[in-house]
């Protein structure tokens, strides 16, 4: 198994879109077309919010990504903002897309509530972390996480945070030494089914020499 870590390239987008669609189970509550658009909105949004990227490539195939953001240094290129705008607009053009987007509007609101309740200012954020389900348990997630930690240390950032929830493997973050700070429960109505989810903020404190 040969794994290479490198910076994000635009040519990685489609493969990463597929990983995100699979990781966040978009097909469980949306048609395939809308699931693809949701993944595109999510990925383009994350790509407006980073200063460091590492993509994992195994045997020539993209299998994971991590994005970290040094908030003080962050500047988003206009092209990334425009890509996000186009993705959101495309989602909102259909009735199904508009209905599904309400769920994600709720999630954004919950994340903001978590930040407000946590009442801490962090110099950095882990903006995106995803690994293909085919490659989990092979140490790729740990490699990506360690690369982000090295970046934080080089930048002399003493802490960072991330948002996660019960749809993700949030136990991974605890194994990497992150601490859960706050949590919030929310019930969604998806396709007539009640879905109970918990949302968290995790933090990591670094010793910066």
Task: Report each predicted region and the residues it spans.
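Conserved acetyl-CoA-binding loop-helix of GNAT-fold acetyltransferases
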Residues: 137-150, 175
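Conserved acyl-donor/pantetheine-binding loop and adjacent beta-alpha core of acyl/acetyltransferases
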Residues: 72-124, 189-195
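Conserved beta-strand-loop-alpha-helix junction that forms the acyl-donor binding cleft
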Residues: 127-129, 133-136, 161-171, 187-190
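A short helix-loop-beta-strand connector motif used in the catalytic cores of GNAT acetyltransferases and
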Residues: 43-55, 71-76, 125
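Conserved GNAT acetyl-CoA-binding A-motif
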Residues: 123-124, 152-165
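Conserved catalytic-core motifs of GNAT/GCN5-like acyltransferases
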Residues: 161, 179-196
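A short beta-loop-alpha structural element at the N-terminal edge
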Residues: 2-18, 70
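Conserved active-site alpha-helix within GNAT-family acetyltransferase domains
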Residues: 142, 154, 166-183
């Amino acid at each position: 198994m040969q794994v290479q870590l490198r910076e994000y390239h635009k040519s990685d987008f489609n493969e990463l879109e597929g990983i995100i669609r699979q990781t966040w189970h978009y097909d469980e509550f949306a048609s395939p077309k809308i699931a693809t658009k949701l993944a595109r909105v999510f990925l383009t949004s994350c790509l407006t919010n980073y200063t460091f990227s590492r993509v994992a490539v195994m045997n020539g195939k993209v299998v994971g990504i991590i994005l970290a953001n040094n908030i003080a240094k962050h500047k988003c290129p206009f092209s990334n903002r425009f890509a996000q705008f186009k993705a959101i607009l495309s989602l909102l053009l259909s009735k199904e897309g508009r209905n599904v987007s309400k769920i994600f509007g709720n999630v954004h609101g919950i994340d903001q509530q978590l930040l407000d309740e946590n009442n801490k200012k962090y110099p950095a954020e882990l903006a995106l972390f995803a690994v293909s389900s085919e490659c989990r348990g092979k140490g790729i997630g740990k490699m990506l996480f360690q690369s982000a930690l090295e970046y934080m240390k080089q930048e002399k950032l003493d802490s960072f945070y991330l948002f996660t929830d019960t749809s993700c493997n949030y136990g991974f973050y605890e194994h990497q030494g992150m601490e859960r700070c706050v949590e919030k429960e929310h019930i969604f109505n998806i396709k007539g089914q009640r879905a109970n989810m918990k949302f968290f903020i995790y933090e990591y404190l670094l010793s910066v020499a």
